[in-house]
């Protein structure tokens, strides 16, 4: 158990975005924070083996960006200084929804577009400036250390040598492929149950040259899938270095290809030609990268009667979402806020309190992601209850009305970016506009 008078050392397993966020809030409480990361950190923005999805488009929702700005002051300026592209989500995004083209209007809701490599590199640099954060890159965790029913540290290895790290708190942020539940069982602890929902979705991505100064009337385009009639989607966003990042997705096992010619053919098959028209004339800068680990997986730590003291699972290690909805980094950022609040409120029963608070944060994005995935006929794991069907129909109506009603559209964007809760869509003045078809 953490002694509030002796918060000496926290160890974070996994040094990708979730781990960096956890380390940031731990650094406010612990005298020393050690980040254990299997990969070596690069000296410049580049992909790492431990972030296999880095080649694909990453959308940082506006709520997530707000939290990053609070935790890492100046991060937005650094992103822009390295070429990130400001985007007004109303005016600059050309979005084909299942209900039609969304209106383009100046919303004042600004996000930034950039590569995952740039974001990870800048956040790690910000965190490395803190004198009480230490790095063990090139090492990975192998097992937990425990005594008296509590986790007391972790066994790490660099491929040649092993070492025991004692810790007052171990935070597992090793991602959706976390082995923490196995380590818990090996140490004699009860591991959580899990629930998995999959739409058998995969995606393929490629970067292209983006000539500066071109005027198109938009900066980014999103051709959304509309299952079950259309299971394919595509998104094209500008990123630093005068590049486009194009990601194509397909659910219901309609996986986009890795072959260059087939990649273009898949883009041509989308519900609108605009994305294909751009990339078919652009110069490719990378090979086609593919990714299929897209299931929604929630390990139900909050249901454990007595989770072990001295140990917290975090980020995708707890709940991993279908990446197509862009929720992962933002939910991890919200989790960091929760972890910081729980740490400041006292040491007793920290894991149990954290998991319960985190579950309240996870519940809405989980519901939105899984209810959308359940639209695909081959989806597994989700329950199409009457409540889910009612919600799907209401969301369909909201999206359709938002294509002609700017009040509903703006609110939908705010909910999508987690600036407002989904319950805002049911407020009387919005409910009336949705039911009556907009103003």
Regions found by a protein language model. Name each.
Residues 5-36:
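N-terminal Rossmann-like FAD-binding beta1-loop-alpha1 element of flavoenzymes
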Residues 25, 45-94:
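N-terminal FAD cofactor-binding segment of flavoenzymes
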Residues 39:
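Residues in the short beta-alpha loop(s) of Rossmann-like NAD(P)-binding domains
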Residues 59-60, 106-125, 179, 225, ...:
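Short beta-strand to alpha-helix junction loop
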Residues 97-116, 248-251:
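Helix-loop-beta segment of a Rossmann-like dinucleotide-binding subdomain
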Residues 113, 242, 254-338, 342-365:
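FAD/FMN-dependent oxidoreductases across multiple families
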Residues 129-271:
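Predominantly flavin-linked oxidoreductase catalytic cores and closely associated redox partners
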Residues 340-439:
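C-terminal helical "tail/cap" subdomain of flavin- and related membrane-associated enzymes
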């Amino acid at each position: 158990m953490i002694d509030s008078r002796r918060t000496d050392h926290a160890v974070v397993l996994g040094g990708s975005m979730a781990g960096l966020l956890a380390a940031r809030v731990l650094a406010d409480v612990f005298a020393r924070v050690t980040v254990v990361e299997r990969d070596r950190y690069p000296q410049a923005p580049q992909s790492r083996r431990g972030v296999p999805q880095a080649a694909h488009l990453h959308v940082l929702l506006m709520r997530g960006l707000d939290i990053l700005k609070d935790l890492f002051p100046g991060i937005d300026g650094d992103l822009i200084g390295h070429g990130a592209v400001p985007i007004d989500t109303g005016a600059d995004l050309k979005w084909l929804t299942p209900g039609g083209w969304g209106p383009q209007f100046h919303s004042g809701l600004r996000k930034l577009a950039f590569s995952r490599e740039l974001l990870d590199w800048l956040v790690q640099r910000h965190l490395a400036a803190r004198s009480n954060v230490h790095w063990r890159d090139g090492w990975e965790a192998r097992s937990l250390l425990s005594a008296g029913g509590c986790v007391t540290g972790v066994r790490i290895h660099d491929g040649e040598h092993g070492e025991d790290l004692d810790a007052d708190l171990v935070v597992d942020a090793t991602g959706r492929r976390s082995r923490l539940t196995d380590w818990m069982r090996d140490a004699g602890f009860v591991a959580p149950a899990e629930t998995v929902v999959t739409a058998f979705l995969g995606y393929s991505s490629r970067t292209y040259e983006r000539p500066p100064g071109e005027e198109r009337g938009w900066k980014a385009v999103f051709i959304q899938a509309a299952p079950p009639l259309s299971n394919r989607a595509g998104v094209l966003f500008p990123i630093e270095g005068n590049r486009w990042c194009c990601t194509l997705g397909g659910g219901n096992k309609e996986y986009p290809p890795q072959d260059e010619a087939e990649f273009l053919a898949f883009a041509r098959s989308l519900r609108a030609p605009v994305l294909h028209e751009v990339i078919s004339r652009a110069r490719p800068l990378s090979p086609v990268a593919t990714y299929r680990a897209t299931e929604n997986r929630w390990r139900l730590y909050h249901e454990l009667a007595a989770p072990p003291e001295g140990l917290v699972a975090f980020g995708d290690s707890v709940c991993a979402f279908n990446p197509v909805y862009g929720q992962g980094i933002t939910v991890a950022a919200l989790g960091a806020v929760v972890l910081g609040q729980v740490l400041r409120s006292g040491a007793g029963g920290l894991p149990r309190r954290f998991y319960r608070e985190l579950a309240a944060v996870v519940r809405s994005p989980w519901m939105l992601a899984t209810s959308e995935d359940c639209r695909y006929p081959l989806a597994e794991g989700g329950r199409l209850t009457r409540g889910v069907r009612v919600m799907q129909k209401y969301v369909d109506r909201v999206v359709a009305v938002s294509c002609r009603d700017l009040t509903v559209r703006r609110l939908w964007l705010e909910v999508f970016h987690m600036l407002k809760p989904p319950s805002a869509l049911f407020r009387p003045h919005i409910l009336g506009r949705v039911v009556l078809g907009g103003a």
